[in-house]
């Protein structure tokens, strides 16, 4: 992922995406950074260029717009960019009773977390297959294995990413493209996330990670060709233990734990 090749990262202006950009630049990877046109992406580009000798291109767009991914793809073709890494990080989520969250918001989650990711893989896979070795990293969640009450659509969307990634990896196993899926637990990416962590008390601090930790572990796992990457040893253990519980018991425990969202 060095030389004149580029790694493309979506949702790169803040949080985990920004951390992936920094971790990639530190390894000498040239970057194509994609995010909403809110001005923050230029700051990320400036910071990277001040620290590392890499090329950084930016593309601002709302990826949920019908032709947005095609516009991004056309940009890369026009620039004749060689891409050997795709990190599908862009995503959104919300918590609350399903019936209390607007249908528009629920569908926005599916649009960005699922439809955009599928479009990105479909458009850019032919470019990745031109390389001797290339990587796709899809951002799922630990919640893909732990369907959470009061986060029904979000956890459903992340379960799709998880299953899609494993299936696509198997389809592509005889070629140059390796697909990995990263399943982080709670990550503090903004003030709202910090408030949520505090609402859960001391238990949350055991599993919560910072964006740079997730990005570093995710990138290492990707480059090693790992299938499933679960940042944080405690989170890894929790996922394994959860499989030992009967589904009914597990769901009751999760409902109690996440009941704090039920008033939203």
Residue map of PLM features:
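Conserved glycine-rich cofactor-binding loop
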Residues: 11-15
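SDR active-site lid
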Residues: 174-234
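Substrate-binding pocket helix/loop in short-chain dehydrogenase/reductase
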Residues: 97-110
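Conserved glycine-rich Rossmann-like NAD(P)H-binding loop of the short-chain dehydrogenase/reductase
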Residues: 27-43
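Residue(s) in the substrate-gating loop at a strand-loop-helix junction
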Residues: 141
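Conserved NAD(P)H cofactor-binding loop of Rossmann-fold oxidoreductase domains
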Residues: 89-94
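Active-site helix of classical SDR
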Residues: 121, 157
């Amino acid at each position: 992922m060095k030389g004149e090749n580029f790694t493309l990262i979506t949702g790169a202006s803040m949080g985990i995406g920004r951390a992936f950009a920094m971790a990639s630049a530190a390894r000498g990877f040239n970057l194509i950074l994609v995010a909403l046109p809110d001005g923050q992406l230029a700051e990320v580009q400036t910071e990277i260029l001040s620290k590392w000798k890499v090329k950084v291109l930016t593309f601002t767009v709302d990826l949920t717009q019908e032709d947005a991914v095609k516009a991004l793809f056309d940009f890369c073709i026009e620039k004749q960019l060689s891409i050997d890494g795709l990190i599908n990080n862009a995503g959104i989520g919300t918590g609350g009773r399903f019936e209390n969250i607007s249908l528009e918001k629920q569908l926005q989650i599916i649009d960005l977390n699922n439809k955009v990711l599928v479009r990105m893989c479909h458009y850019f896979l032919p470019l990745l297959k031109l390389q001797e070795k290339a990587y796709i990293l899809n951002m799922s969640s630990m919640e893909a294995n732990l369907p959470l009450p009061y986060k029904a659509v979000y956890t459903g969307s992340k379960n799709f990413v998880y299953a899609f990634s494993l299936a696509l990896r198997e389809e592509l196993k005889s070629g140059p493209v390796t697909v990995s899926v990263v399943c982080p637990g709670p990550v503090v990416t903004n003030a709202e996330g910090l408030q949520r962590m505090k609402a859960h008390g001391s238990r949350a601090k055991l599993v919560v990670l910072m964006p740079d930790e997730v990005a570093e572990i995710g990138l290492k796992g990707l480059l090693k060709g790992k299938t499933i990457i679960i940042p944080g040893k405690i989170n890894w253990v929790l996922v394994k233990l959860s499989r030992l519980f009967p589904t009914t018991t597990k769901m009751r425990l999760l409902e109690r734990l996440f009941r704090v969202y039920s008033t939203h």
